[in-house]
Amino acid sequence: MTQRRDFLIGAAGVAVGAVAATTVGKMGGKEDAPKMSAPAVQTKPTDIIKWRLQTYSGAPLGAHVIKPQIEAFNKAAFGEMEIELYYADQLVPTDELFRAMQNGTLDAVQSDDATMASPVDINVFGGYFPFSTRYSLDMPVLFKYYGLDKIWAEAYGEIEGVEWLSAGAWDPLHIFTKDPIRSVADLKGKRVFGVPTAGKFLSRYGLVPVTLPWDDIEVAIQTGELDGVAWCGFTEAYEVGWADVCSYALLNNVTGAWCGSYFANSNSWNALSPKLQELFKLSMDSSHYYRQVWYWGGEAKLRVEGKKMELTEIPKAEWDEVVADSESFWDELASISPRTEKVVQAYKEYSHVMEKAGVPYRY
């Protein structure tokens, strides 16, 4: 058996012999002497692929829901590609995001299907689908294990020029207002900035959904054009300044998570190398993870420690009636097409499993 001491002595002898041979070779001018090669230096490519990506969100919110992802992607792409990030309405109005991406004005978009007016039957499930989820983790599970990923891919696969890439969860939906809401009757007549599908449902109770440019919302609340927002959860309300102009926060939430997606122009996406495509997919996953943590922690902390808004609540008996009403709303959306029926069925199946699973999935 070779002993450690013998091995070290032998290795040292080989090293000395190699150095001697190299020295003799150099002194004798022999061309076949061993040569040391310079270390490889990685250089950035000269031709950079540039993308323009616009998000639905304004800059204060975008600093969390997408900016870290894009900065990390640009760094990791090492000069092969650079994504220029634009916020709500900077290049095109939010409701024109889809068409702008389809015609190549934009290379990619981050938005929900409904807000950007996607011409697909399933767009009603983008954003806030009332009472479809309890927690933000529900959303990725629905896409991964209950078939929503295949349904979304099928729907957008029928439209030329656009690729659906990935979906993820954002925050729960609460209502923030200047005047308190302590009963369902208090919803009547309140003009709120809100997302399409949830707004349509809440209009059953007299709430008035209003669409305005994202950056105009704070001023619209201050001037009385709006009575509040039904667009987000506590984290966003505090982050973007809406908590500064709203006095009350309704604890009853309309759903547990906002459903948003990433999309790309087909030509822009197909022009990328497989490596860059995978890198962008990884960056989307990193953004999904960032949002899960940011929202989950923020919602709880601000409910407990936030001091800008007074918390109100609609009594459970009244709110249970609203939840029950959502069943007919689900059926209404299911009747749009065979595909929307599949989506509703997936949500129903998932809800059944979660309720049957019990704590901690449902309480």
Positions of PLM-derived features:
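N-terminal secretory/targeting leader peptides
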Residues: 2-138, 157-158, 162-363
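Short, solvent-exposed secondary-structure boundary motifs
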Residues: 151-157
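A gly/proline- and charged-residue-enriched helix-loop-helix capping module
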Residues: 136-151
